[in-house]
A protein has these predicted regions:
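Intrinsic-disorder/low-complexity, polar/charged segments enriched in Ser/Thr/Lys/Arg/Asp/Glu/Gln
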Residues: 17-23, 61, 70, 96, ...
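Short, highly charged C-terminal tails/helix-capping segments
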Residues: 146-173
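Beta-strand/loop substructures that line and gate deep hydrophobic ligand-binding cavities in soluble
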Residues: 90-143, 147
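Glycine-rich portal/gate segments that line the openings of hydrophobic small-molecule binding cavities
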Residues: 44-45, 53-92, 171-172
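Hydrophobic pocket/interface hotspot
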Residues: 33-37, 43, 62, 75, ...
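Hydrophobic ligand-binding cavity/cleft-lining segments
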Residues: 4, 8-56, 172-173
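Generic structural detector for well-ordered beta-strands
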Residues: 23-27, 74, 100
Length: 173
């Protein structure tokens, strides 16, 4: 899908650019992992306490102030235990995010094949500046989720600030 729009600031053409993460084998069943992501308030629970003040969330939306920019995400569609689609909501650029919760296979038959796809409206300069960083960030999210499903927490993560009951019965991710 390629759309052509005039950017309001730079007056240059923007194109829908697609980024896709690698696939990660999460050791949690799709239904359980999916339920962790359905409520946007769960994302606030994962933040350190000192960062939560800049983030507001309800079931369908989450907004934050990041380096002076307000950015928001809204759930566009939920397909139970399969995917969640998010769209920009008050963000300075148009984007669409899809989180996939596919059934695992082989050694991970009871787990989830998790991956993320992002489409963002970027001009050529922004695409060149951000392209690799977006892909790296998506891959890091997948790796962190896979590691967490195997009991390895990210560096600097303080479990005492995490409320696992928000993620379906206290079992964590």
């Amino acid at each position: 899908m390629l759309s052509l729009h005039c950017c309001n600031i730079l007056q240059r053409y923007c194109f829908m650019t697609e980024f896709e993460s690698k696939h990660g084998q999460v050791s949690t069943p799709p239904y359980q992992l999916y339920m962790s992501f359905t409520d946007m308030r769960n994302f606030v629970s994962m933040l350190p306490a000192d960062r939560r003040n800049d983030v507001q969330a309800d079931f369908d939306t989450i907004t934050a102030s990041i380096q002076g920019f307000n950015i928001g995400v809204k759930v566009h569609e939920r397909v139970p235990y399969s995917r969640i689609e998010l769209v920009d909501w008050g963000a300075p650029l148009a984007f669409h995010i899809v989180l996939y919760f596919d059934p695992g296979s082989g050694d991970n038959a009871y787990g989830t094949d998790f991956h993320i796809k992002v489409e963002a409206e970027l001009n050529l300069m922004m695409k060149m500046m951000l392209g690799g960083k977006v892909k790296d960030a998506l891959d890091k999210i997948v790796d962190t989720l896979v590691d967490a499903s195997h009991g390895k927490m990210p560096e600097g993560f303080d479990p005492s600030q995490f409320d696992p009951s928000r993620f379906g019965g206290g079992s964590g991710v």
